[in-house]
Every structure is written in C-alpha cells, then in structure tokens.
Amino acid sequence: GVKGVLACMQLADGKLLWIKSYSKDFGAKWFGGNAPGSSGTAASRHGNNGPPVTDDKYIYAPAGGHEGASLVCLEKRTGKLVWKSGNDYAAYAGLMIGELAGVKQVVMVTAANMKGYRAKDGRELWSVPVKTGAARNIVTPILHGDTVTVASHTVGTFQIRIRNSGTGQVAEEIWRNKNVKTNITTPVLIKGHLYGLGTSRGRNSDFVCLNHQTGEVVWSQKGYDDYASVIGMGNTLLVHG
C-alpha cells in the first residue's frame, strides 16, 4: 500500500493472516514529497505503490529498502522472508517474472534503474539505467523472448536483450526511440507491435504503434489523454483516455 504495508488476508472473511511493514521490516523510506535524486521540481512521490507479484509458493515485492532490501521474496502463506536484494529506491512500476537467456528472474524497474534478479536467490544478474528528473518510473517492463522493453517520460522507449556472459548476464541495447516518452501507460504487445501513448504534451498525447523489433513508429493518432489505459484483446485494442 501507499504507506508501505504488505498484507495477506483470507479471502472468505478478510481475516489478517500476516503483515509486513516496508519501513520497519526492510528499512524503506516513505516519500510524500520529492524523492532522493529528483530535480526537486517534479511532481511529489506518493509512497510505495509498486504492486507485488506471486509465483508458485512465493510473493515478490518492491519494498524499496535502499540498504539491501530493494526487492524481497516472501513465502506466500506465512510471510516468512526467503531473500532480499538490491539497494535502489522503489518506483511505481509493476514487477515481471520470466525466463531470460535461460534464467528465471524478476525484472524490476526502480527509481533510477531496471534490474534483473535471479528468482531463486535474489542475485542481481544485470542492470541498466533509467534515470529521470523525478526519480520515479511508472511503466511496467514488457518481456518477450530474451528482450525487455520499457519506457520513461525522460529517456523515451528502449529495448534490451539479455545474454549470458561468463557466470552472469549482460544487457545489450537493441534500440531506443527518444521521441516516444511514455509517462504512465504500459504499452501492450500484439503480433510484433507495441501500442501505447507517446510523449505527453500537457494532458494531450498521441496514441502510437511501434515496431517491436526496431522501435520505429508505424502510425500515430492524436487526441488522447496522458493517463489512458490500454488493453489488448486478440486483434482489438480497448483504449480509455
């Protein structure tokens, strides 16, 4: 939640089964104003908003503890800590779990970076910078094959490919489109194309279609808000904005 509380409740009656505090248990700081590393003129942060994700017996949560608990893995039924890793402050982006270059991992976009953590033990596998003037990122990364695509209102939209190197992994940039600066809406991937909002111009954005392999704009359409939601249903797009 906004104040950094992760809770598990029984669905039938709402009984609280376990609860964790990001600040007390993992050393996270709550931000109600400008986040560390921001320009000081950006919109205020509103606490811890990145959603957790479950996988098998575990739940992964972007706790944002900058002293070894940026990302935490807990037992889903008990809330017991399995591992913690990383030193970055949290962002608003959702976590993604997938296999990249043969390694199952959790991809996390933090306040200043995008990182891959090995799912079984939290080992950091790779990292690329996603620095913004506001020290916050919102768009959830898109995993496809061994590639990860992400966007920011400062750096634009870019894609990396993960490959194994020695005992670890490296991230290689495939393309970057600096003109498509998606701020809030996560694009959807359908049949080799990314669909989402482009650069915001004060509550007025273009809806754009990008080639997933090259990052080139295929087409664009004006007249959308900065906060439109996009849902892909087969060959149909539902766009609210």
Spans of model-derived segments:
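Noncatalytic, solvent-exposed loop/strand surfaces
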Residues: 1-241
